[in-house]
Amino acid sequence: MNLFDDDVQLNEHQIAWKSNEPDAIQKCADMFKEKPENEFFKIINAINEKKSMSIAQVDYSKFMVENSLSQFPECMPAVYMMNLVGSELSDEAHFNYMMAAIPRGRRFSKWAKLVEDTSELLVIKLLMKHYTINMNDATEYKRLLEKNNKLPIVLKELKAMVTDEFLKEVTKNVKEQKQFKKLALEW
């Protein structure tokens, strides 16, 4: 016969609850939460595949849902309408509208990303520094210089300003800095 037969083994949740430590209780409660990324993809899949889902306990971001769905042409009318009038809707109403308006289908692709022409950025930053103007004005200067065929002449005069310090201001990427140096030597 064992003297300790009446001792009940407590699990970690019971131990945290009986200790009355808020941090320990919260840590145990957080074990049951899903990662925000998983919740977001569940929402998008529910909209795309027309599966009902409760939005009450989920962190629902109207912006992220609209941004995600706007990557596909067939979803654009619904997303456009929500951008115009959907800001006042509750999360549940927004989700219900998207469920009704978005055509059913499996949508998977990489998101579109902004691709900047780095050589154009170099010219604009160079004009900004030389004329001490802002980026919008430098873009306008560049357009006017190209129109009057004066840009190559101005760049030839300004290539001495392309130093290592200047290139570090333009980009932190060492490979791009080397490309910019090479480009400046060609002017």
Curated annotation (Swiss-Prot):
Alphabetical keyword list: DNA replication, DNA-binding, Viral DNA replication
Segments forming a coiled coil: none
GO terms for MF: DNA binding; DNA clamp loader activity
GO BP terms, alphabetized: DNA replication; viral DNA genome replication
InterPro entries hit by this protein: Phage_clamp_gp62
Domain of life: Viruses
Quaternary structure, from the entry: The sliding-clamp-loader consists of 4 large subunits and 1 small subunit. Interacts with the sliding clamp; this interaction allows the sliding-clamp-loader to open the sliding clamp. Part of the replicase complex that includes the DNA polymerase, the polymerase clamp, the clamp loader complex, the single-stranded DNA binding protein, the primase, the helicase and the helicase assembly factor.
Family: Belongs to the Tevenvirinae sliding-clamp-loader small subunit family.
Protein function: Forms the sliding-clamp-loader together with the small subunit. The clamp loader holds the clamp in an open conformation and places it onto the DNA.
Protein name: Sliding-clamp-loader small subunit
Organism field: Escherichia phage RB69
